[in-house]
Amino acid sequence: FVVTLLLNALLGNAALAQGVLVAPTPPPAQDILTRAASSVGVKRCLPAISRLSGMTVQGARSHDVLLDWDRKQPDDGPVFSLIGLEYTNAGVAASITAIPESGGACTVSAERISVAPYTCASIAQQELVGYQMTKLLPIFSVYTDPKEPNSSVSLIDSPPGCLVIR
């Protein structure tokens, strides 16, 4: 009891109430595309690039990026990227392109490219019900959803599987 009173007098009650200090959890590492775009001077489209890239690399074991940009005007020119993604059982590629517009806005395009071990016809039947199909070539079909006119899914027959571009 005397020790407790002495500690209270010397250190205050807060010292007795403190638990073991735990180091704060570091924030998740920034994805490579966001770091690369930022390092070359891209600012205006960086929030859109970062948001899309973060969603793209989520769940990947590792990823790397190929980046092309306007070296004379990095913040005013287009940014093109190709991202390679490694998953436990598959490899995927993604492309993110950002083009600054007047007034500070950005036009952004994103695609995910993968190979499915199924026929393109079976993917269309299971995943693209209600989509409209446009056949570009006998092996290449583009599907659009009337509810999302700015989005498409391309299926390219590549036996024994299907190349899928979303």
Regions picked out by a protein language model, each given a short descriptive name:
Residues L136, S141-E148:
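Short, flexible domain-boundary/linker segments around small modular repeats
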